[in-house]
């Protein structure tokens, strides 16, 4: 996981904040290692599972099993963690400054889908029934690691409040000094030097943004980004960015990716049932939707 992590922590005990931050960073790094498919995170890691789970069930590290257990209880087919073959095809095409061949794209889609793998929660094992399937947890791993780091911080009794920021996946622990909520900025999806506006995070809340500006390349004036529709294998064109405020960093990360793949009308329907989620959406045409439960605290940047 290639991301910059910053932790601001406050303590009423001398030296406690530095110790807590070091411990939280170690937790983040360990969680990131076992959920990263590109680097060998050791026994029970996703790297090992992707290498061996087609031959026999792989016993998972507790951190990886915990994340897969969460995902196993999510019913949304629109977010497919078995999309790695398609992701790899696009990464190869990007390195050669071209588009994937349509027939190659269709072939890679044959090796995706929840039916291609089996997670046994009781045994904490993972197996694949297709030798070409691989899981990619990039849509949720950062949020999961942020929650793990936050749990480590809270074990230090002297920590009064903290803010964790892992590449835009942000979590608040307590209110900031002065008992005020944390105000965090949302990146403008078309201006890397500007922000769209700010939202407030209270104790325990998290924010995550998925956008077409984070990893992309352009061909003939068309932007090809990394958030792929698992039905078509193509970059989703519904939004420029989706920011989600949620009770956990994992929930925020999961739903920001999921909502990026859904039309705004469906997102609104889901928000009716999920009262603990709030969103800021930049549509493909640049218009902005802010959910009703965020209207009073949302502060757009000047000129927005």
Please place each PLM-identified region on the residue numbering.
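Active-site-proximal beta-strand/loop segments in catalytic clefts of secreted hydrolases
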Residues: 9-10, 82-86, 165-166, 186-188, ...
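Single conserved position on a long alpha-helix in the C-terminal lobe of the eukaryotic protein kinase
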Residues: 175-229
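Short, surface-exposed beta-strand-loop junctions and turns on beta-sheet-rich folds
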Residues: 13, 143, 178-179, 215, ...
């Amino acid at each position: 996981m290639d991301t910059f992590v910053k932790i601001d922590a406050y303590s009423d005990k001398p030296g406690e904040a530095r110790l807590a931050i070091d411990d939280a960073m170690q937790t983040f790094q360990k969680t990131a290692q076992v959920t990263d498919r590109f680097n060998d995170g050791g026994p029970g890691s996703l790297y090992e599972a992707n290498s061996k789970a087609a031959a026999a069930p792989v016993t998972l590290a507790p951190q990886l099993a915990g994340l897969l257990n969460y995902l196993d209880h999510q019913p949304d087919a629109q977010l497919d963690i078995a999309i790695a073959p398609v992701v790899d095809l696009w990464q190869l095409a990007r390195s050669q400054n071209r588009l994937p061949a349509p027939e190659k794209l269709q072939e890679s889609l044959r090796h995706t889908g929840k039916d291609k793998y089996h997670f046994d929660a009781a045994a904490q094992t993972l197996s694949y029934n297709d030798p070409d399937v691989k899981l990619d947890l990039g849509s949720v791993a950062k949020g999961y690691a942020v929650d793990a780091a936050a749990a480590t911080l809270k074990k230090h009794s002297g920590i009064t409040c903290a803010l964790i920021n892992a590449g835009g996946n942000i979590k608040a622990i307590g209110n900031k000094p002065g008992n005020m909520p944390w105000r965090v900025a949302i990146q403008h999806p078309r201006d890397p030097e500007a922000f769209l506006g700010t939202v407030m995070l209270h104790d325990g809340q998290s924010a995550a943004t998925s956008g077409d500006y984070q990893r992309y390349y352009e061909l003939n004036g068309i932007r090809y980004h990394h958030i792929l529709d698992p039905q078509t294998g193509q970059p989703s064109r519904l939004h420029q960015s989706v920011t989600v405020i949620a009770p956990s960093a994992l929930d925020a990360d999961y739903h920001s990716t999921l909502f990026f793949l859904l039309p705004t009308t469906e997102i609104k329907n889901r928000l009716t049932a999920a009262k603990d989620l709030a969103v800021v959406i930049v549509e493909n045409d640049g218009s902005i939707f802010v959910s009703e439960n965020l209207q009073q605290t949302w502060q757009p940047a000047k000129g927005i």
